[in-house]
């Protein structure tokens, strides 16, 4: 029992460290955004640091993820061939994501739910440095977040390939994803959690992280259009 607890705590710490590495990288872009108008040359240096560290971090994530799968892979994660049927499933799941967001917008417009607390800050940051913030949100954030909240998460927890672990893992992955996007227990967290659950289902359905990354990419791209 003690061994299992220590094993679980070790995985929690590792996931936190991986998340901290990603947040540190995104913080560099926040600094660049904050100095974009007051010190443009400094902002460009931080953009360079963001891109270089993102490249290194991405290489680390890919290496560690593959190493995990080589050591233990009871769910047989790997590469699933891209076929018309798989594209159709991804697009159907994307429509489900849009439906969740449409429902959420209706609840906000009708003053049933409050708007996200961070919405104003996100819009202000985008206006300060639109190209780099949008590029990061669309291309880099989906990759890092899918590795953390889906790839590494399911390599650390709920590893057994059985229905109970699958559905509980989808729920917990979604809740962690939702909480990390709001840092609060709120209706907004449940909204993000629903999106996270759909992405987790996509990852487990295809057993290929490229599909959940593609879905996350489509979602973030739609958000800026």
Regions found by a protein language model. Give the residues of each.
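Short, Lys/Arg-rich, polar N-terminal cytosolic tail immediately upstream
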Residues: 1-7
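Alpha-helical transmembrane segments of multi-pass integral membrane proteins
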Residues: 17-18, 45-50, 89-93, 97, ...
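Transmembrane helix-loop junctions in multipass membrane proteins, especially transporters and channels
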Residues: 34-38, 65-73, 109-114, 182-186, ...
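Transmembrane helix-loop-helix hairpins at the membrane interface
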Residues: 128-225
């Amino acid at each position: 029992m003690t061994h299992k607890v220590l094993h679980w705590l070790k995985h929690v710490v590792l996931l936190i460290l991986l998340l901290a590495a990603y947040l540190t990288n995104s913080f560099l872009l926040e600094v660049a955004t904050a100095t974009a108008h007051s010190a443009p040359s400094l902002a460009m240096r931080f953009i360079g640091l963001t891109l270089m560290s993102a490249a290194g971090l991405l290489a680390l994530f890919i290496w560690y993820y593959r190493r995990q799968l080589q050591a233990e892979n009871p769910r047989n994660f790997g590469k699933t061939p891209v076929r018309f049927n798989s594209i159709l499933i991804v697009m159907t799941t994307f429509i489900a994501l849009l439906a969740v967001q449409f429902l959420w917008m209706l609840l906000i417009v009708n003053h049933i739910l409050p708007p996200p607390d961070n919405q104003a800050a996100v819009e202000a940051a985008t206006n300060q440095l639109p190209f780099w913030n949008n590029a990061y949100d669309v291309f880099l954030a989906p990759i890092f977040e899918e590795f953390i909240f889906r790839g590494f998460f399911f390599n650390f927890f709920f590893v057994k390939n059985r229905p109970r672990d699958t559905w509980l893992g989808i729920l917990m992955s979604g809740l962690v994803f939702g909480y990390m996007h709001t840092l609060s227990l709120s209706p907004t967290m449940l909204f993000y959690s629903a999106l996270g659950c759909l992405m987790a289902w996509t990852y487990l359905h295809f057993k290929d992280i490229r599909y959940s990354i593609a879905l996350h990419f489509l979602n973030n791209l739609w958000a800026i259009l």
